[in-house]
């Protein structure tokens, strides 16, 4: 990370896409995408996804590391080009507890991530706990972030400290996505970004963390990009010019969250304007979902009814029987809720792919289609971009390859934005 940031600060319009997903096919797609490019790949886990108690994936930080390393080994991707990050590390998961106990757990969370070899750490203590006022005083946020940083510094080995970097601040929706519709986005004011930096510097120095301040590479801000279930707010560079200008006077860059579904030109403009770390998550699993739905349509054409995976029906059955991950997010009307379940940009379906019934039906879908020849016309009908790539000779038409390439469509847009010499 330090090399990428220093190159950006030296004047290169270079950035990095942060892949925020625990889905094995998404991680495989990212590693295969940059297998021969020489680029670093940044993969991040969030605190609610992966923590010392297992998170919703059931993985602790060391488990997630081994999970990613296992995929890297299968792909042949060298570990030295992998950067592991932890996102929203702080009391996010324990906001309903008193601040003291939430912070104790947050300290252990940080220690677990750093000990497991995660080198990009987002120190996020912005959320109010059960006995806190709302919103929190910025100095309280900074002091708590400094305590988390202290835990990281005391845990890291000398070798780990060579690579250890911190991200501070937050200007983002609740980790996991917006719960309601958005109409407009407040772009961070440069004076608020400056205050975030100043309060964190003071809090770090008060704990003797002067050396750690040199590891702070980025501030999270809101440049004016967002999405909800049905709409996208696109980047408007002119609205963020003052913010973009301010960061030039610091040794840092910005980190932008929720950059999913922006245009490739928007990614290039964001990187140009010093939002050099672009986070993406739901757009990747949205592309995965599109690929699986497309393959299900092909299966309906090619496989007899009694042999089909019924993947679409299984998804509906599971999500309707177990609505915990989508009910409070989606529209209450039945017909609208079904549209959201299938096609929402926030892609709450991503939480259901590990479900045993859904996983088995996806495996059967892929096995069924591996046993037949996929007609080019059918691929053109349901996956037209992949059909073009087949015609160009850069893709072979297996179900697995089609899924991987569909996910990589998203990564291609980020590569355009993060790499100035890509046309």
UniProtKB/Swiss-Prot annotation:
Which pairs are disulfide-linked?
A: none
GO terms classed as biological process: D-tagatose 6-phosphate catabolic process; galactitol metabolic process; phosphoenolpyruvate-dependent sugar phosphotransferase system
Pfam families noted in UniProt: GatZ_KbaZ-like
| Pathway of action | Carbohydrate metabolism; D-tagatose 6-phosphate degradation; D-glyceraldehyde 3-phosphate and glycerone phosphate from D-tagatose 6-phosphate: step 2/2
Keyword annotations for this protein, in alphabetical order, are: Galactitol metabolism
* InterPro entries per the UniProt record, alphabetical: Aldolase_TIM, GatZ/KbaZ-like, GatZ_KbaZ_carbometab, TagBP_ald_GatZ
As given in the record, the signal peptide range reads none
Q: Give GO cellular component annotations, separated by semicolons.
A: plasma membrane
Quaternary structure (record) = Forms a complex with GatY.
The record's NCBIfam families line, in alphabetical order, gives:
agaZ_gatZ (TIGR02810), PRK15052.1 (NF011626)
Q: What does this protein do?
A: Component of the tagatose-1,6-bisphosphate aldolase GatYZ that is required for full activity and stability of the Y subunit. Could have a chaperone-like function for the proper and stable folding of GatY. When expressed alone, GatZ does not show any aldolase activity. Is involved in the catabolism of galactitol.
Q: Which family does it belong to?
A: Belongs to the GatZ/KbaZ family. GatZ subfamily.
Specify the protein name. Answer: D-tagatose-1,6-bisphosphate aldolase subunit GatZ
